[in-house]
Amino acid sequence: MSSLYFDNYIKENKPQFKAKVDSISTMLSINPDWLLSVMLLESSINPQAVNKYTNAVGLIQFMPSTATELGTTTAELYEMNNLQQLDYVYKYLSRYAGKMNSLSDVYLSVFFPAAVNKANDYILQTSSLSAAKIASQNPAFDIDKDGKVTKAEIESFLQNWLKKKRLSFPHD
């Protein structure tokens, strides 16, 4: 069951949303807090969040090409509420079911799928996207400032980010 520290970030349909996140997480065999953490980092758990640079939309920042692969558009995703959009979150992440063994694997499924289940020294890059470009576009991930981002750096960033977030959550 998902943690209470995400409650303040879920703006609508809170009980139904949490129940659906729990259900999706069970189907994907992942911790629901991992999924909520990724949505919090990507969109502040806002289904109408839009990245002004990439036009990515929604809870996990669906790129236009990804939306098309999933049989929808970013415009349609933008019009959906949080419950409706979770169907597409599941549809997208189901591609990686059985491969997501950590928070970083869930995050990388969204941010850089080729890195899922790779060794910690795996450098994020492709034949058309250099390690240096990824590092320059995502400086928070290049922790050692060496012009490349490794899976270990993503893991470190996520753990530090999560610790900071937990410190800012209200305590019961």
Which stretches of residues belong to each language-model region?
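Catalytic glycan-binding domains that act on GlcNAc-containing polysaccharides
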Residues: 2-144, 151, 155
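Low-complexity, Gly/Ser/Thr/Pro-rich intrinsically disordered linker/tail segments
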Residues: 154-172
